[in-house]
Amino acid sequence: HWNWKEGEDVDVWAYFNNADEVELFLNGESLGTRIPEGDAYHVMWRIPFTPGTLEAVSRKGGKEVKRTSISTASEPYALRLTPDRSEINADGTDLSYVAVEVVDKDGNLCPWAENEIFFSVEGSGFNAGTDNGSPISLEPFKSDRKKSFYGRALVIVQNDGDAGEIRVKATSPGLKESTVVINSK
């Protein structure tokens, strides 16, 4: 993520294995190009945080091979659901892990969000569990709600043995809800 305190020094690492060099840009301004030393698979910049867009451009033989960017998130606006699979077996045991993210109006992850998220699952499946990755959370695994941790949570959906659609819905007060459909076949 690219959300820190203004002026705070941040170490930015770029990992690569199919490039000769990486150039880093902050809000369109080049912060320089780095070439790996020896067998290193990363290069690093230490820069003061400035809100905006951080972009890394990898090149091999002078040609661009990859461009990756992240932007500073604004206030939490919506929930985003992303299943690891959109189709599971209708065998009563297959699972889909649905990642939940708190995002701003531009779709950027809000890394400091701690919103309480409520889940409902309808159709040919059920909520097999929830998680958020927090090592100190005392919330039960089998629950229809979970507080986001660094803007993220997880709901695990299990097929109930019948073929058909599984509709997973996530809501949180003040945020735009999200629904995703997983097919059981």
Predicted regions located by residue number:
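Long hydrophobic segments that form regular secondary structure
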Residues: H1-K66, P83, V103-D106
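Beta-strand-rich structural segments
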Residues: V12-F16, V57, T82, T93-P111, ...
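Short aromatic-acidic-glycine turn motif
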Residues: R34-I35, Y77-L81, F118-S137
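Short, hydrophobic beta-strand segments
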Residues: V43-F49, P140-G161
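Edge beta-strands of extracellular beta-sandwich domains
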Residues: G62-E75, K176-K185
